């Protein structure tokens, strides 16, 4: 039976920083305010794999945002290596071969896979320029259904698409949303964004937040404010929670 996700565990702070020293300094500043961290490509290539392993050993949850997409054998073996770090989540692009291979690599481990539907920096015009005949919402829906059929654990998608996707995939797939900006924050390079409270109310399970926390004068206070927004939204909607 599913158990409750605490509001604090729903916030994933993106360590989009240039090096391990900067990331470790930020983790120290955040202290107990944050339990879940995302490590992306930039930090991974700067020594982030070791950091991920240390975070997991310290009891933090780790999301490796590597968006794997390669020949199946490479994806499977790379996923197996990530699983050995103790990470909780790993992203893979929402193509059937990559998703199937990643599942094989994660077999027998606690690692959960999140399929990337459409990058939150893309809009319909970007897809058209890349040769897609469908818009963002149609492509997100198609990839979400395929990911569920393959057995992927969750999805990465814009908060705008959570209400579209939830009826298609049911209650058990975790919906993890980047593009989260507290009211008044700079939108940066995201095109499909939403506030934390609205994202939770719309059906998101976990929220990825980077610069509004790591770029704040007081990162721990910024994180606590977002956690409070999440808790308030959960109370308002009476959300059924899952691990």
UniProtKB/Swiss-Prot annotation:
It comes from the Bacteria. Keywords: Decarboxylase, Lyase, Pyrimidine biosynthesis. It is an enzyme of class 4 (lyase). The keyword Lyase applies. PROSITE patterns: OMPDECASE. Substrate binds at residues 16, 38, 65-74, 120, 181, 190, 210-211. GO terms for cellular component: cytosol. The active site is at residue 67. Catalyzes the decarboxylation of orotidine 5'-monophosphate (OMP) to uridine 5'-monophosphate (UMP). This is Orotidine 5'-phosphate decarboxylase.
């Amino acid at each position: 039976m599913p158990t409750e996700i605490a509001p604090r565990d729903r916030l994933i702070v993106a360590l989009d920083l240039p090096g391990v020293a900067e990331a470790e300094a930020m983790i120290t500043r955040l202290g107990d305010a944050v339990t879940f961290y995302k490590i992306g490509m930039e930090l991974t290539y700067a020594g982030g794999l070791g950091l991920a392993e240390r975070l997991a050993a310290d009891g933090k949850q780790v999301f490796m945002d590597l968006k794997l997409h390669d020949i199946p054998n490479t994806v499977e073996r790379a996923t197996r290596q990530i699983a050995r770090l103790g990470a909780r989540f790993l992203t893979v692009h929402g193509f059937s071969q990559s998703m199937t291979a990643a599942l094989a690599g994660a077999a027998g481990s606690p690692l959960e896979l999140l399929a990337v539907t459409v990058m939150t920096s893309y809009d319909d015009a970007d897809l058209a320029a890349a040769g897609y005949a469908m818009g963002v919402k149609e492509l997100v829906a198609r990839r979400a259904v395929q990911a569920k059929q393959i057995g992927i654990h969750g999805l990465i998608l814009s908060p705008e698409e959570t209400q579209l996707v939830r009826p298609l995939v049911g209650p058990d797939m975790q919906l993890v949303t980047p593009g989260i900006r507290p009211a008044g924050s700079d939108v940066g390079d995201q095109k499909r964004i939403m506030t934390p409270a609205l994202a939770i109310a719309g059906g998101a399970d976990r929220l990825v937040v980077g610069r509004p926390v790591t770029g704040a004068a007081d990162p721990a206070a910024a994180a606590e404010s977002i956690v409070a927004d999440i808790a308030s939204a959960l109370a308002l909607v009476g959300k059924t929670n899952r691990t």
